[in-house]
Amino acid sequence: MKVLVGTASWSDKSLVASKKFYPREASTPEARLRFYATRFPLVEIDTSYYAIPLAQTSQAWADRTPGHFAFNIKAFRLFTGHATSPRVLPPDLRAELPPLKKENFYFRDVPPELRRALWDRFKEALEPLRASGKLGMVHFQFAPWLLRNKSGLAHVELCVEAMAGYTVSVEFRNKTWFDDAHLGQTLAFERALNVVHTVVDGPQGFHNTVPPVWESTHMNYSLVRLHGRNQETWNIKGATVASERFDYDYSDA
């Protein structure tokens, strides 16, 4: 068994600001990635959740890392059911959006032909990593309001079908997926789709947290994501970046 350990992003604001990891000369994103890859064999790309990266960008990531290095990449937020601003779409595809009544839109608001174009653009962004053998999992962190019901199951199936040929990992943020009545069914559903179940270690007691379910649903891979035990900041209002919600500097107690 081989275990790969990494962080979510090599340029996380708190990681850079701590000045405890990167040497002084690693002052650019390129230099930080090159240094990071000498310390860890894996990283999770977080920026792809906020906007679909350019293929040139992912090619640069592949070029700046050694052959054994792996990238897990988060799926674009529109695909996972989160509110999305038109501003983050590629300009040519943004023009294909129908008129919107609100500032943000959701996957359900997107016409089928534009959905296909967005999936294609996302996979184009992954191709340099895939071609170099450095693409790990494509991680779908679904929105907290994605319930385990008919429409929720159908949306997960749609995403997995759209990413056929890729190793897909799924993370649910709603308790209906793992309550006593549905835990076994959810794991069976994940196994039937051949997706990687995500073991989530995070604070408990919130509407958007789930218990850690230590099960494996994929023949080759398992995934554990450590979100910390940060009760006070988990749902902090006004956070502009994910790092504002996390605190990993714990006392020995």
Label each residue range with its predicted role:
Residues 1-253:
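Residues lining hydrophobic/aromatic ligand-binding pockets adjacent to catalytic sites
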